[in-house]
Amino acid sequence: MENQRVKPSAYNIIIEKPDGLAIYNTVTGKMIRCFNDADVVRNILNAEMVNNYAENSIIVKLYECGMLVDANRDEIREIEKKEREGKFGRYMQLILLPTEQCNFRCVYCYERFERGIMSLEIQDAIVNYVEDNIEQFSGLNVIWFGGEPTEALDVIERLSLRMIEVCKRKRKVYNAGITTNGYNLTLENFKKLKKLHITEYQVTIDGLPAIHARQRFLLNGEKTFEVIMDNLKEIKENIKSSTITFLIRTNFSKEMLEHTDEFCEILDKNLSNDKRFQCFWQMIGDYGYIKDESVKNLFGMPKDYQWLVEKYTSRVINSYTRGLYGPDGGVCYALKRDSIVIDSAGSIRKCTCDLDSNVNYFGKIGENFDAKKHEEWMNKRNINENSSCYFCKKRPLCHNRACYKAKKCLPNYSALNLILSQMAEDSENYEIIGEKTNE
């Protein structure tokens, strides 16, 4: 490496540890730890400019990991360009709602269940859209959403087979996942979905059976916990494929926090020793239309999430959530230029949390697409210099233009320094710079 002038990256997060430093760069997703040489590294990263000498192994390593960058590099302009283009992958992404009806009535749900099952005409239009546009992409990523998508299994099967055929014929990769409440996810239905190349599953279990029963119940008020857990256990015991993954989401209420140990025991009893099942813990939030004050009383505070991170690190930080803290890991699908939502009536949208807003409507599949409005949507969410996001060190992770619905930073990123500090306790997550005295 030739000698050159370098400077500290604008996207270094420095965590002070009792035995040294942890540094995480949000552009590269690299973490390093330094121990004996912590003061040396701290001084380098606090300098305005540094001479990068090939013989200085510490400087070379910091440069390789992105903690130091070329002196003339404009990192903010690079990120702005990426955000303007909205290109966060090589795949066309379709979020499809085969029905907007649901067999559950969750207390915090933002959906209104006003539309039914997707018609054959809309299905035909979706297949035609894939046929006409897939050539410019490496493949197709389909996410089945709802309502409850398994209430329209025939639509999923019919559409999947046709889209798979298009991708096979055009030599494109086909991936699929599904967000489901898990009630209809019997072993028989799971086998059907697996044959349709659906490999990623998100299922929600809201804690202890009694708490889950108060938050996630059937349309007729009946309980759902046991059915969901039995379905998951049967899949775990009978399906050995390593290509499937289950994200077990838990929406924590304030009440659930004091029962977390009991909940962990339930998870361990039923789903332990299987890396295909990963936890995703969030605090209950308001994504719209919640008017019942008793439901709002369930909401936790940022400090509650931080408590979960501190006390249950191994549950909160896993192979799935680590991806959220990597470059582009938290980019909302609605900010991706090549991602669209198609609801059961064929309306083209960007966000699944705002299905009835004209702001979130861009035409009808197979009939018209308002490209100008879509471009305005993308541009409106560009971060300007007056935004608190503009100089944020977390910006390369989410590019988030704080969600127009939530109007705040994601809880995961609000607690990012704590999460990174906990990650720095596991040697699998970092490289060591300099020397470390063996104790």
Give, region by region, the residue ranges found by the protein language model.
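Flexible mid-to-C-terminal extensions adjoining Fe-S/redox cofactors in radical SAM and related proteins
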Residues: 6-10, 355-439
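Conserved alpha-helical substructure of the radical SAM core
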Residues: 76-191, 196-199
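Short cysteine clusters
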Residues: 102, 106-109, 332, 346, ...
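Radical SAM enzyme [4Fe-4S]-AdoMet core and its adjacent flexible, acidic
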Residues: 206, 210-335, 341-345
